[in-house]
Amino acid sequence: PDAAFILLRGVAVPLISVALMLVGPLILLPYRRFNDVLDGASFGATSAVAFVGAQVIAQSIDLFGAGLRPGGDSLLWIARLLTHGVALPLVAAGAVGAMCGAFWLRYRAPVRDRSRLGVLGTPLVALLAGAALYVAAVLALLLLREIPALLVVGVLAAAALVWLRMVVHLGLLQESLEIPIGDPIVCSNCHHTTLTHTFCGNCGVALRALPKDARRASVTETAR
């Protein structure tokens, strides 16, 4: 492809796509009930996955005319499916989710937490980094063959998910501070006594993720 095509399809269109992915989540930013970093990360990741999924379906609609077994090397088709159906949505989810998390961190989180992510917690830096990740992924699809493109986009997806994981971790810490510490119970996972809160103080399991029957049994056992 020539330079004009690369600039249009590899840079301009991905940047416009990222902007569209951000519109929905940022509309929710002023609402005070969505005041956690985890809210921003969730909205951004959901918007990105939905957008990329719709985009991939729209761009691939002609492929349905080839039937259930299109011609060509099956390995290359598997690489295409993994790239467009898994790796690229993960890049978008990680990048846009982390970008939205940076906005929530700056404008909704307590002042004490605003430096917890370093420079990546600054909205402008997060925008540039997230856009660069997505543009790099799209350029890899345009310029590389199927298997090298899958490898490159897979590495970018891993980087985006690590970044998103940092944002989610901070959001979970913020939510844990909003929940009061309750009475001692017996953790049904490790059977040690721990205070009623978000996680078991001994084994680290999420107490709210345990089955309700197990939680009731823990309270009953402690009462005895």
Q: Where are these predicted regions, by residue range?
A:
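Hydrophobic alpha-helical segments at protein termini of multi-pass membrane proteins
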Residues: P1-R224
